[in-house]
UniProtKB/Swiss-Prot annotation:
Name of the protein this chain belongs to: UvrABC system protein B
Family: Belongs to the UvrB family.
HAMAP family for this protein: UvrB (MF_00204)
Lineage: Bacteria, Pseudomonadati, Pseudomonadota, Betaproteobacteria, Rhodocyclales
Domain (Helicase C-terminal) ranges: 443-596
Coarse class of the protein's main subcellular location: cytoplasm
One Pfam family matching this protein: UvrB
Keywords: ATP-binding, Cytoplasm, DNA damage, DNA excision, DNA repair, Excision nuclease, Nucleotide-binding, SOS response
Gene Ontology molecular function terms on file: ATP binding; ATP hydrolysis activity; DNA binding; excinuclease ABC activity
Length: 685
């Protein structure tokens, strides 16, 4: 069924709670892809792959599939930046449904660690982004309350959070006329980790004014609830604006969700305390028997302090290290994660699956190696090893019906596919670039002449090399021959990288040389030529997937072309050339059959740079990095002031979801602390 809201058609489907705002009808390969994926889900296929080329509208296809199936969906993205983009797009498609954002809520995180070689213990240090914490709590609330939910998440979703059973047991249901003692209500709020604050009323707090209790729900950023009591009875429930105090809506019932995912009923905490004491007794005895008296004293002192806090307050610093006891799990059992909150019929979309799947697989071992040191030297009990991300095989067992989304699916997707659905034809009519193979022996001189030809008509060139040395030498050679050129490599941080791309688009230089130009964000419409040097050197940077990804960088220009410099055609080259040619044939045939004339993508320069680059800064030469500030001459007072300023900037950028800017402020903070205090602030080497 189709209706219209503000001139945007709204599409609904039978038995689906989703209302899809459809600014344009599906085009190109989208209609067939949507139909096939929806059929596959209906037929019960556990795994499907959407092979969608760059610029083919994969997010739009996902939104259509979700709307047709009418089931809650989890969309897994490889990083925060891409997750934020997907979140914004899904909110445009589903403004009337629950689109949620679940990523790590740390602006800054330094994990607890011990470096035996230096006898250095590094305390856990972190800065939590309150806005993202609220969004995480909102995500789990939506899953418990409704079916029309889309959650965009990063790999953070495989890390342990509170057990959904305990979380659900702590929910407070309020109804008009319900009998509950004023004191009991306050105690329930404290048990749910709400803080009483009669002066600073903010998210996750409550205040008491006579018989009136105001609660600012942890998962809500805009509205609070007023509970008016009379003689141990809930007389009125009202939503109000916590800033102005204006009443918004009278309620008959209201549900208050816990202030944290880690809340635990009192009975469970007391039971866990006894289990922790038993483990402490065994561990301390083992250390003493082994002659490790320092470790025995250390584990006793640290754990006894935590036990006292748990007994008195119901939580302690580092409570996640006792999650096995608190959730009643056995040794080695997987922790509860966001996936446990999903209903059994949920859908999982793994975006950029060739990156996301290996990322999920790599989390467990890195976390384990750090914790083994903490356990071995008496800083933590062995049960802390079970506070961990999911192992890959555990993640696999929990995966609901899954759709992998990628332009270059990897081996895992090939081994787990009920069907592969192609989305090769772009709605814009653009076709993949033509490919030339030329001899590697004359690659530099040939590249120089090709670059001059492109520059003469106002187009840009990307060049990818195998080594950093080659990139630097080639940059120098091209510069000596009058080409405006810069290079990009791993030593350049996020913000500098974005600045370089901005300058390339603005025409401040014409050729960009790099080693691995596959990373998200390098879709530059002005680029008409991609040159791959030494394309016949088999390896990670010249694999079939890497070549296809690199060739695709020229796919947004009507004159797009890729040149592979090689003396022999390798298996990877042949596969990449054949795949690109297959796509071109299909795209050209579709355009001819439908009378579509391709045109270069028009994208405002600020679209790539928004939220990252602030203001025009004059930069000359081939280096865009500003010299780092000099801190050696600062006195103690100035250093402290600078640290506070940088921390404030970092938190402000993270609050605005400007993760690149937040990362730049964080790195500057690291440098300042390291130069001032002579300590490595990054944690373990």
């Amino acid at each position: 069924m189709t209706s219209s809201t503000d001139s945007v058609p709204v599409i609904t489907f039978a038995d689906s709670p989703f209302r899809l705002h459809q600014p344009f009808p599906p085009a190109g390969d989208q209609p067939a892809a949507i139909e096939l994926l929806t059929e596959g889900i209906g037929d019960g296929l556990m795994y499907q792959t959407l092979l969608g080329v760059t610029g083919s509208g994969k997010t739009y296809t996902m939104a259509n599939v979700i709307a047709r199936c009418g089931r809650p969906a989890l969309v897994l993205a490889p990083n925060k930046t891409l997750a934020a983009q997907l979140y914004a797009e899904f909110r445009e498609f589903f403004p009337e449904n629950a689109v949620e954002y679940f990523v790590s809520y740390y602006d800054y995180y330094q994990p607890e660690a011990y470096v035996p070689s230096r006898d250095l213990f590094i305390e856990k240090d972190s800065s939590i982004n309150e806005h993202i914490e609220q969004m995480r709590l909102s995500a789990t609330k939506s899953l418990m309350e409704r079916r029309d939910v889309v959650i965009v998440a990063t790999v953070s979703c495989i890390y342990g959070i509170g057990d959904p059973v305990d979380y659900h047991a702590m929910i407070l249901h309020l109804r008009e006329g319900e009998r509950i003692a004023h004191r009991d209500l306050v105690q329930r709020l404290v048990a749910m980790q709400y803080t009483r604050s009669d002066i600073d009323f903010r998210r996750g707090t409550f205040r008491v004014r006579g018989d009136v209790i105001d609660v600012f729900p942890a998962e809500n950023a805009e509205l609070a609830v007023r509970i008016e009591m009379f003689d141990d009875e809930v007389e009125h429930l009202t939503l109000f604006d916590p800033l102005t105090g204006h009443l918004k809506q009278k309620l008959v019932r209201f549900t208050v969700y816990p202030s944290s995912h880690y809340v635990t009923p009192r009975a469970t905490v007391l039971k866990a305390i006894e289990a922790i004491k038993d483990e402490l007794r065994d561990r301390s005895a083992w250390f003493q028997t082994s002659g490790k008296l320092v470790e025995a004293q250390r584990i006793e002192q640290r754990t006894r302090f935590d036990l006292e806090m748990l007994n008195e307050m119901g939580f302690c610093k580092g409570i996640e290290n006792y999650s096995r006891h608190l959730s009643g799990r056995g040794q080695g059992e997987p922790p509860p994660t966001l996936i446990d909150y999903l209903p059994s019929d949920a859908l999982l979309f793994v975006d950029e699956s060739h990156v996301s799947i290996p990322q999920v697989g790599g989390m467990y071992k890195g976390d384990r190696s750090r914790k083994e040191n903490l356990v071995g030297y008496g800083f933590r009990l062995p049960s802390a090893l079970d506070n961990r991300p999911l192992k890959f095989e555990e993640f696999e067992r929990l995966m609901p019906q899954t759709i992998f989304v990628s332009a270059t699916p990897s081996t895992y997707e090939a081994e787990h596919q009920g069907q592969v659905v192609e989305q090769v034809v772009r709605p814009t009519g653009l076709i993949d670039p033509a490919i030339d193979v030329r001899p590697a022996t004359t690659q530099v001189d040939d590249l120089l002449s090709e670059a001059k030809r492109r520059i003469a008509v106002g187009e840009r060139v990307l060049v990818t090399t195998l080594t950093k040395r080659m990139a630097e030498d080639l940059t120098d050679y091209l510069a000596e021959n009058g080409i405006r050129v810069r290079y990009l490599h791993s030593d350049i941080d996020t913000v500098e990288r974005v600045e370089i791309i901005r300058d390339l688009r603005l025409g401040k230089f014409d050729v960009l040389v790099g080693i691995n130009l596959l990373r998200e964000g390098l879709d530059i419409p002005e680029v008409s030529l991609v040159a791959i040097l030494d394309a016949d050197k088999e390896g990670f940077l010249r694999s079939e997937r890497s070549l296809i990804q690199t060739i695709g960088r020229a796919a947004r220009h009507i004159n797009g072309r890729a040149i592979l410099y090689a003396d022999v055609v390798t298996r990877s080259m042949r596969a990449a050339i054949d795949e690109t040619e297959r796509r071109r044939v299909k795209q050209i045939a579709f355009n001819q059959a439908n009378g579509i004339v391709p045109k270069t993508v028009s994208k405002r320069i600020k679209d790539i740079i928004d939220g990252v680059y602030g203001g025009d800064v004059e930069r000359d030469g081939r280096s865009v990095a500003e010299p780092p500030p000099e801190y050696f001459s600062m006195n103690e007072k100035t250093v402290a002031k600078s640290i506070r300023k940088l921390e404030k900037e970092m938190q402000e950028h993270a609050r605005n979801l400007e993760f690149e800017k937040a990362a730049a402020a964080r790195d500057e903070l690291f440098r300042l602390r390291q130069r001032t205090f002579g300590a490595d602030q990054h944690g373990t080497p």
